[in-house]
């Protein structure tokens, strides 16, 4: 079994999925993963479908130099956003795989949440491109590893009655006790 960067608090209530050496842009995939981190599974899948249809965009926060601006980024408080289709498809496949793993464990798919998603750089794949005057330049791709953990959310527990309790110090408790004794006598 491979080691994940994060461990879930309750392994019986979580399912994981991972992809290694995936031939998809590391930077785009990292931004896509950050966009859905902590979301419910159904919401994340719906959002990624909307990104593919260009109805919503992925906000680019870290790797955003030379990226055009779009109004669809306002939803996330950014101006720079894109629609990285290849990254979205890879993450959608992993979410589907994680959901299948969760259902095989007997977990409820409607309660699943993306509790951990991480994108790491894989070794670059090297090629070469031929330039003018007999020069040769590197032509590298930046693949990545993706891992995610889906966790079944616990039922919400109602808050206890928040009535104000009177807190007394030792001297006040002693005075109160003597007053009770006096009134009882």
UniProtKB/Swiss-Prot annotation:
Keywords: Ribonucleoprotein, Ribosomal protein
Signal is among the record's keywords: no
GO terms under biological process: cytoplasmic translation
Pfam families: Ribosomal_L22
CDD domains, sorted: Ribosomal_L22
InterPro entries xref list: Ribosomal_uL22, Ribosomal_uL22_CS, Ribosomal_uL22_euk/arc, Ribosomal_uL22_sf
Protein origin, superkingdom: Eukaryota
GO molecular function per UniProt: structural constituent of ribosome
Gene Ontology CC terms: cytosolic large ribosomal subunit
Family matches, as PANTHER family: 60S RIBOSOMAL PROTEIN L17
Similarity comment text for this entry: Belongs to the universal ribosomal protein uL22 family.
Name under which the protein is recorded: Large ribosomal subunit protein uL22
Organism: Debaryomyces hansenii (strain ATCC 36239 / CBS 767 / BCRC 21394 / JCM 1990 / NBRC 0083 / IGC 2968)
């Amino acid at each position: 079994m491979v080691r994940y960067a994060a461990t879930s608090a309750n392994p019986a209530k979580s399912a994981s999925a991972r992809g290694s050496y995936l031939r998809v842009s590391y930077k785009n995939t990292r931004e896509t993963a950050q966009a859905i981190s902590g979301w419910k599974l159904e919401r994340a899948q719906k959002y990624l479908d909307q990104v593919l249809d260009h109805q919503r965009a992925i906000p680019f926060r870290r790797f955003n130099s030379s990226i055009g601006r779009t109004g669809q980024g306002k939803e996330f408080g950014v101006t720079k956003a894109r629609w990285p289709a290849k990254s979205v498809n890879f993450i959608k496949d992993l979410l589907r795989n994680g959901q299948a793993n969760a259902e095989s464990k007997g977990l409820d798919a409607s309660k699943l949440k993306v509790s951990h998603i991480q994108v790491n750089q894989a070794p670059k794949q090297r090629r070469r491109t031929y330039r003018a005057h007999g020069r040769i330049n590197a032509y590298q791709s930046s693949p990545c590893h993706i891992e995610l953990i889906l966790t079944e959310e616990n039922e919400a527990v109602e808050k206890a009655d928040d009535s104000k309790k009177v807190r007394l110090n030792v001297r006040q408790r002693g005075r109160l006790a003597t007053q009770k004794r006096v009134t009882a006598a």
